[in-house]
């Protein structure tokens, strides 16, 4: 799967889960399970409930995603 196949959507972090996982509510109302991307983890960017984030979803499984950006 190439980078062109991913779906980028924005959402709000609802709750933190163990192992750097988060429940994110997307703008369209769906809730997905998202983990933190490597660059966010390496730069020690903290993600808290209520933060606006950009989530990258795979077209094969729309219930899981990767948090790639935390909006300021």
UniProtKB/Swiss-Prot annotation:
Keywords: Cytoplasm, Initiation factor, Protein biosynthesis, RNA-binding, rRNA-binding. Residues 1-72 form the S1-like domain. It holds the Pfam family eIF-1a. PROSITE patterns: S1_IF1_TYPE. Its main location: cytoplasm. CDD domains: S1_IF1 (cd04451). It is found in: Cytoplasm. GO terms for cellular component: cytosol. GO terms for molecular function: ribosome binding; rRNA binding; translation initiation factor activity. Transmembrane segments: none annotated. It comes from the Bacteria. PANTHER family: TRANSLATION INITIATION FACTOR IF-1, CHLOROPLASTIC (PTHR33370:SF1). Belongs to the IF-1 family. Component of the 30S ribosomal translation pre-initiation complex which assembles on the 30S ribosome in the order IF-2 and IF-3, IF-1 and N-formylmethionyl-tRNA(fMet); mRNA recruitment can occur at any time during PIC assembly. One of the essential components for the initiation of protein synthesis. Stabilizes the binding of IF-2 and IF-3 on the 30S subunit to which N-formylmethionyl-tRNA(fMet) subsequently binds. Helps modulate mRNA selection, yielding the 30S pre-initiation complex (PIC). Upon addition of the 50S ribosomal subunit IF-1, IF-2 and IF-3 are released leaving the mature 70S translation initiation complex. This is Translation initiation factor IF-1. It comes from Carboxydothermus hydrogenoformans (strain ATCC BAA-161 / DSM 6008 / Z-2901). The lineage of its organism: Bacteria, Bacillati, Bacillota, Clostridia, Thermoanaerobacterales.
